[in-house]
């Protein structure tokens, strides 16, 4: 199973990816984790990413795609993978699909976790309070959600147009949401 989980901040992507990894016995791939691993390993891509990040800039699509290609050659990916929160724009989606076609591992499904904005703000605010993060004001959260909607809505449409998108209600108990995702990807 080769799966992408999309959803706004606070939608439960990371939580569900962790659960699905165990259930489906496949690798969980997070771009943030990939960046940290490549930097820690001192690879050429890691060095490039560190230089960009140290300058306060976003890592380019090319660097992320290079890291993804490297990650997809690891043995734990042979049975499949869950990509959590990537791709974030249509250019990344096109490049990733090209890479997956090249290595003979096209996506089986893309799942969009749908959660109402007010609930997302509530979830993130609650999480921020538990973790003691003062920077997660409702205004800042709304701004992050707007950026997500501006950049990722076209990715959702991109995969919907290819017939690989499943929209799943991301509200409810964790077991219920997991069951909805499993039903959607096995349908």
UniProtKB/Swiss-Prot annotation:
Keyword set, alphabetical order: ATP-binding, Cytoplasm, Kinase, Nucleotide biosynthesis, Nucleotide-binding, Transferase
Membership in a protein family: Belongs to the adenylate kinase family.
Name of the featured protein: Adenylate kinase
Enzyme class: transferase
Any one Pfam family match given in the protein's UniProt record, by short name: ADK
SUPFAM superfamilies according to UniProt: P-loop containing nucleoside triphosphate hydrolases (SSF52540)
Domain of life: Bacteria
NCBIfam families in alphabetical order: adk (TIGR01351), PRK00279.1-3 (NF001381), PRK14527.1 (NF011100), PRK14528.1 (NF011101), PRK14531.1 (NF011104), PRK14532.1 (NF011105)
GO cellular component terms, A-Z: cytoplasm
Signal sequence bounds: none
Organism of this sequence: Stenotrophomonas maltophilia (strain K279a)
LID as annotated region, ranges: 126-136
Function: Catalyzes the reversible transfer of the terminal phosphate group between ATP and AMP. Plays an important role in cellular energy homeostasis and in adenine nucleotide metabolism.
Organism placement in taxonomy: Bacteria, Pseudomonadati, Pseudomonadota, Gammaproteobacteria, Lysobacterales
Subunit structure: Monomer.
Catalytic activity: AMP + ATP = 2 ADP
């Amino acid at each position: 199973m080769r799966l992408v989980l999309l959803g706004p901040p606070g939608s439960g992507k990371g939580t569900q990816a962790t659960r699905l990894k165990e259930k489906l016995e496949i690798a969980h791939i997070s771009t943030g984790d990939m960046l940290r691993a490549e930097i820690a390993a001192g690879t050429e891509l890691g060095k490039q990413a560190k230089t960009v990040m140290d300058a306060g800039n976003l890592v380019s699509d090319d660097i992320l795609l290079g890291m993804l290609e490297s990650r997809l050659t690891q043995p734990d990916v042979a049975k499949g993978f869950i990509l959590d929160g990537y791709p974030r724009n249509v250019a990344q989606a096109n490049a990733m699909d090209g890479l997956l076609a090249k290595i003979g591992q096209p996506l089986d499904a893309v799942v969009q976790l749908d959660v109402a904005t007010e609930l997302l703000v509530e979830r993130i605010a609650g999480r921020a309070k538990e973790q003691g993060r003062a920077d997660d004001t409702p205004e800042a959260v709304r701004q992050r959600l707007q950026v997500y909607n501006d950049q990722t809505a076209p990715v959702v449409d991109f995969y919907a147009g290819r017939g690989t998108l499943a929209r799943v209600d991301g509200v409810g108990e964790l077991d219920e949401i997991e069951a909805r995702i499993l039903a959607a990807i096995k349908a």
